[in-house]
């Protein structure tokens, strides 16, 4: 596994981040496809054995049970100082309503730390932009979380570049803790972030940790092939309902490049992301250890410029999605 600094921080993270949305009690929350604790723990352990030290979860994943499962596994399988743990705040959890008010942020971080069984998280991220709370209130509360030692750094996710630029400027003006990472929706068939967000992050030294790097499984198999997970994944249906013949052509070229390299589609799709400047660690999700082993090998693949061009050429602009 390769490791890089996360933006301007002193955190060194693996080139792949393990997304923990998959881990959670199926009877909690709104995703019936999640893995219960006994099925989640072996995957987390295998990730650690494979060199992954970066784990991303959220307060809302499976109504908090993702944080509980991840926290217990990391306590059992790793030393706290050897892992980088990121969580998020915004969505409703139990009786905590959706939002980023000061009260919501301060309660949420305490609840997350309790569920994780940790004294601090390395990164507390705002999951979405809150249109009902003044951004100054949100940013000052996040700064207070850092000052209290409950989060080492703060990050953001899924917003317009103009909003992110506004937040960064306010943080500079007030001397508040600045966002060090942006978790955005970015993959071979959704590249709208290349227009404004990625250049902004590169300019500001903000690390990019893309979510859905494999388009929720669509870049791992022949185009149009379905699975039980794809059928039941309402989020994925909303994200990729505008997919068209250009996306199918990209998927076809992905198959060709992967065959040329003797690699899998998923490995090449991740290698493409890792070739982009400013990309710290794509967030991978997996439900089986053998899938994880496959993805771990992506860090060893280097694409040639002509292969990158082959994959990128068919892309056409898409409607902006992923901010809700």
From Swiss-Prot:
* EC number assigned by the record: 1.1.-.-
Q: Name one GO biological process term.
A: thiamine metabolic process
Does the keyword field hold Phosphoprotein? no
Pfam families documented for this protein:
Aldo_ket_red (PF00248)
Looking up Gene3D superfamilies in the UniProt record yields: NADP-dependent oxidoreductase domain (3.20.20.100)
Name the catalysed reactions: D-ribulose 5-phosphate + AH2 = 1-deoxy-D-xylulose 5-phosphate + A + H2O
According to the lineage, what is the superkingdom?
Bacteria
Supply the enzyme class, top level.
oxidoreductase
Q: Which UniProt keywords apply?
A: Oxidoreductase
The record's annotation in InterPro entries points to: AKR, AKR_Detox_Biosynth, NADP_OxRdtase_dom, NADP_OxRdtase_dom_sf
**Annotated control of activity:** NADH, NADPH or ATP do not increase activity.
- Which PANTHER family does the entry mention? NAD(P)-LINKED OXIDOREDUCTASE SUPERFAMILY PROTEIN, NADH-SPECIFIC METHYLGLYOXAL REDUCTASE-RELATED
What is this protein called in UniProt?
A: 1-deoxyxylulose-5-phosphate synthase YajO
Q: Organism, per UniProt?
A: Escherichia coli (strain K12)
Q: Which gene encodes it?
A: yajO
């Amino acid at each position: 596994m390769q490791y890089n600094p996360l933006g301007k921080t002193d955190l060194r993270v693996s080139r792949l981040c393990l997304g923990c949305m998959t881990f959670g009690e199926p009877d909690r929350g709104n995703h019936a496809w999640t893995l219960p604790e006994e099925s989640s723990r072996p995957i987390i352990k295998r990730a650690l054995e494979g060199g992954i030290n970066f784990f991303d979860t959220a307060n809302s994943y499976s109504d908090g049970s993702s944080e509980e499962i991840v926290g217990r596994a990391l306590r059992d399988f790793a030393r706290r100082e050897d892992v980088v743990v990121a969580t998020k705040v915004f969505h409703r959890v139990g009786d905590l309503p959706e939002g980023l008010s000061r009260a919501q942020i301060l309660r949420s971080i305490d609840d997350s730390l309790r569920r994780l069984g940790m004294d601090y998280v390395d990164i507390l991220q705002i999951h979405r932009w809150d249109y009902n709370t003044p951004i100054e209130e949100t940013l000052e509360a996040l700064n207070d979380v850092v000052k209290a030692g409950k989060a080492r750094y703060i990050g953001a996710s899924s917003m317009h570049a103009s909003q992110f630029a506004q937040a960064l400027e306010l943080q500079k003006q007030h001397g508040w803790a600045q966002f060090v990472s942006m978790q955005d929706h970015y993959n071979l068939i959704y590249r709208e972030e290349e227009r404004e967000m990625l250049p902004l992050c590169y300019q500001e030294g903000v690390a990019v940790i893309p979510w859905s790097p494999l388009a929720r499984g669509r870049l791992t198999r022949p185009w149009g092939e379905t699975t039980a997970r794809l059928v039941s994944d309402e989020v994925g249906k909303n994200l990729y309902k505008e997919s068209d013949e250009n996306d199918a052509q990209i998927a076809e070229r992905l198959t060709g490049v992967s065959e040329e390299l003797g690699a899998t589609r998923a490995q090449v799709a991740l290698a493409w992301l890792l070739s982009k400047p400013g990309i710290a660690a794509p967030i991978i999700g997996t439900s089986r250890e053998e899938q994880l082993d496959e993805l771990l090998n992506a860090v060893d693949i280097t694409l040639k410029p002509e292969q990158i061009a082959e994959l990128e050429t068919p892309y056409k602009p898409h409607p902006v999605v992923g901010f809700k």
